[in-house]
Amino acid sequence: MKKLLIASTSTIHGTGYLEYLLPTLTVFFADVKKLLFIPYARPSGISYDAYTKIAQKAFAKIHIEVVGIHEFDNPKEAVLNAEAIFTGGGNTFELVYQLYKNDVLATLKQVLENGTKYLGTSAGSNICGVSMKNTNDMPIVYPPSFTTLGLLPFNINAHYLDPLKNSKHMGETRETRIKEFHVFNETAVLGLREGSWLEVLGDSITLKGTETGRLFEKDKIAKELELGLLIIK
């Protein structure tokens, strides 16, 4: 049975790394002593070691040891043997590129479908959808495929932002870009605002946190999703 926390962001304004999620993580990972961290997304281009130290500092507050996947000679074996797994945010293109390069995407999907607990934030949440096509990130590398874990029947647009009233910005809004996506694609997209996350237990998907979600479906008017159980096909 899938046991996933899929968060829009690792950090909300005015707080520390994962601070807003710690009460939830304390309960979710109550039986976990050691967690495998996947730092492949490298926010701001930081090293795997530096990124892993950030995760270690946060999880030390709830007495969980963190080890980076890059520390293992065999990353597939590390995924297979992990008590729990956390994929952090950064650049989704780089993350997916490395998951394919190290041949761990299929193994990651396998263990998560079989019940290994998982936390994803930002890019680590994007990969839980059918594809990574609704990332906000720049294509700094070219992964062999945009297909990702498919643990959700829809895609995630993390850090979803609503249009700002009276803004003079002339670029596309998130909603406009998602409409462009639906000209060529059928997959539904959930705009996940900062401060909210999905809790997935088996086939049950619950929107939690402080913000509503925004659901985009092809040829339909976008709609707000209240906190609580979601039914998205």
Language-model segments: residues:
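Flexible gly/pro-rich beta->alpha loop and the following alpha-helix that scaffold active-site loops
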Residues: 64-117
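Short helix-loop-beta junction
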Residues: 53-65
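C-terminal and late-domain segments of enzyme folds
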Residues: 2-31, 42-53, 139-233
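A short beta-strand-loop structural module common to alpha/beta enzyme folds
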Residues: 32-40, 70
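Short, active-site-adjacent cap segments at secondary-structure transitions
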Residues: 43, 93, 125-128, 197-199
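A general structural motif
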Residues: 1, 30-35, 82, 115
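Structural motif
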Residues: 5-6, 84-88, 119-120, 156
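Class I SAM-dependent methyltransferase SAM-binding "motif I" and its flanking Rossmann-like core
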Residues: 96-98, 105-167
